[in-house]
Amino acid sequence: MSKDLEVAGRYANALFQVAQDKDLVDVFSEELTELKAALKANKDFVKLLENPTFTTEQKKNLASAVFEKINPTLRDFIYLLIDRSREDYLSVIADVYQKRVNDLRGVADADVYSVVPLSEQELTALSRVFATKMNKTKLNIQNHIDKSLLGGVKVVIGTRIYDDSLKTKLKDMERQIKA
């Protein structure tokens, strides 16, 4: 684990604990998702927030203006990050926090690769099968198109890969023939 991810993980875990204590897990989850999207959409704001020539107070004033509608506890957390010069970790903290929420809820994210877009029924069936396989209550599936698969699907959940693509089957046959 990289040092940055480790540091962000500690902050995310602390925020998650506070959210649980104050019964704000879902509120923080929604607000962090919106916050991350806003940071991604507005690179200039991120540059200002991470600019070393800005004082801590200037950064807090900027954050206060932009984040005025978020939960006060979450805003205080952002101020803490600014005080500790950790504002550049905010997106990673949001990701780690969401993973903790998903773990709590028994939810996992899955990427499904296919040659053509899958129907809702197919995605639902895959979700049921793989949620059971992963001991999860739900899978959030993102369908990606990958023409190189030739047919079938490849499912990626965390570090696990389930590859039932025609491309892989052909490669396996080729290896068996050569052996």
From Swiss-Prot:
Gene3D superfamilies referenced in this protein's UniProt entry, alphabetically: N-terminal domain of the delta subunit of the F1F0-ATP synthase
Q: Name one GO molecular function term.
A: proton-transporting ATP synthase activity, rotational mechanism
| Topological category with respect to the lipid bilayer | Peripheral membrane protein
Q: Which SUPFAM superfamilies match?
A: N-terminal domain of the delta subunit of the F1F0-ATP synthase (SSF47928)
GO CC list: plasma membrane; proton-transporting ATP synthase complex
**One Pfam family from the UniProt entry?**
OSCP
Q: Which InterPro entries match?
A: ATP_synth_OSCP/delta_N_sf (IPR026015), ATPase_OSCP/dsu (IPR000711)
Transmembrane region positions? none
Report the subcellular localization.
Answer: Cell membrane
Which processes are annotated in GO (biological process)?
proton motive force-driven ATP synthesis
Q: What is its main location?
A: membrane
The alphabetical list of record keywords is:
ATP synthesis, Cell membrane, CF(1), Hydrogen ion transport, Ion transport, Membrane, Transport
Per its database record, what is this protein's job?
A: F(1)F(0) ATP synthase produces ATP from ADP in the presence of a proton or sodium gradient. F-type ATPases consist of two structural domains, F(1) containing the extramembraneous catalytic core and F(0) containing the membrane proton channel, linked together by a central stalk and a peripheral stalk. During catalysis, ATP synthesis in the catalytic domain of F(1) is coupled via a rotary mechanism of the central stalk subunits to proton translocation. This protein is part of the stalk that links CF(0) to CF(1). It either transmits conformational changes from CF(0) to CF(1) or is implicated in proton conduction.
Task: Enumerate the NCBIfam families for this protein.
Answer: ATP_synt_delta, PRK05758.2-4
Which family is it part of?
Belongs to the ATPase delta chain family.
Give the HAMAP family listed for this entry: ATP_synth_delta_bact
Q: How does it assemble?
A: F-type ATPases have 2 components, F(1) - the catalytic core - and F(0) - the membrane proton channel. F(1) has five subunits: alpha(3), beta(3), gamma(1), delta(1), epsilon(1). F(0) has three main subunits: a(1), b(2) and c(10-14). The alpha and beta chains form an alternating ring which encloses part of the gamma chain. F(1) is attached to F(0) by a central stalk formed by the gamma and epsilon chains, while a peripheral stalk is formed by the delta and b chains.
Q: What is this protein called?
A: ATP synthase subunit delta
Q: Print the organism lineage.
A: Bacteria, Bacillati, Bacillota, Bacilli, Bacillales
